[in-house]
């Protein structure tokens, strides 16, 4: 996960570190064996295999595995939790050297380059403060060049109000468009029912934007 809340960055680092220290990869509610909808949306952008892609809050997610499997060669994963990143590195083994790993709070991070695809599944909905959402949007604007793509998956308006002991803010494509401003045009939005490892269905929305200017 990646982001800041009123409880503070250091406390959030401790929180997520404890989550990944005390639970197995398959024991967290957001676990996906195969991140099918994320992959489908990334494919829909039409970017080439050498396109720079960043996964925000990617931590222990298996999206990076799938991107490497599909031949993408410029993948970056950013997460607030070093423990989550370590889980992915261990799972990938030697292939982890093909990925750039960044442990950082996305709301304070300064992008070192631009990306053709910015993907975020679940990190954004943990930003409960308006100033943190604004800081996130500023990073997106700096990191995604005109013509680039932004994919954000969050709990939908009828989704959970909390996750892993933390409050979340639920979104739809309209609320995301309002936060992102006029530089990003909505291309598509999808509703998604995620079934947790415990069998609970959580309602998500995924929105794909293209930077227009």
Locate predicted features.
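Conserved acidic residues
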Residues: 116
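Class I (Rossmann-like) S-adenosyl-L-methionine-dependent methyltransferase catalytic domain
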Residues: 2-113, 127-143, 149-213
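Short catalytic micro-motifs in class I SAM-dependent methyltransferases
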Residues: 122-126
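A conserved beta-strand element that flanks and buttresses the S-adenosyl-L-methionine
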Residues: 119
């Amino acid at each position: 996960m990646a982001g800041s809340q009123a409880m503070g960055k250091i406390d959030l680092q401790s929180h997520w570190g404890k989550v990944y220290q005390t639970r197995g990869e398959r024991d967290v509610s957001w676990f996906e064996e195969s991140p099918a909808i994320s992959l489908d949306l990334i494919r829909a952008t039409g970017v080439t295999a050498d396109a720079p892609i960043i996964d925000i809050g990617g931590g222990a997610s298996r999206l990076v595995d799938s991107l490497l499997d599909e031949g993408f060669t410029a993948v970056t994963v950013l997460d607030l939790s070093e423990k989550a990143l370590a889980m992915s590195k261990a799972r990938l083994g030697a292939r982890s050297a093909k990925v750039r790993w960044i442990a950082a709070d996305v709301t304070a991070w300064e992008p070192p380059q631009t990306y053709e695809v910015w993907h975020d599944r679940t990190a954004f909905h943990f930003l409960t403060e308006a100033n943190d959402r604004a800081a996130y949007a500023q990073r997106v604007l700096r990191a995604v060049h005109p013509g680039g793509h932004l994919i954000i998956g969050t709990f939908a308006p009828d989704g959970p109000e909390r996750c892993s002991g933390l409050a979340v803010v639920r979104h739809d494509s309209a609320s995301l468009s309002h936060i992102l401003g006029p530089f990003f045009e909505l291309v598509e939005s999808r509703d998604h029912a995620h079934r947790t490892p415990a069998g609970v269905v959580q309602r998500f929305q995924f929105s794909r934007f293209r930077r227009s200017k």
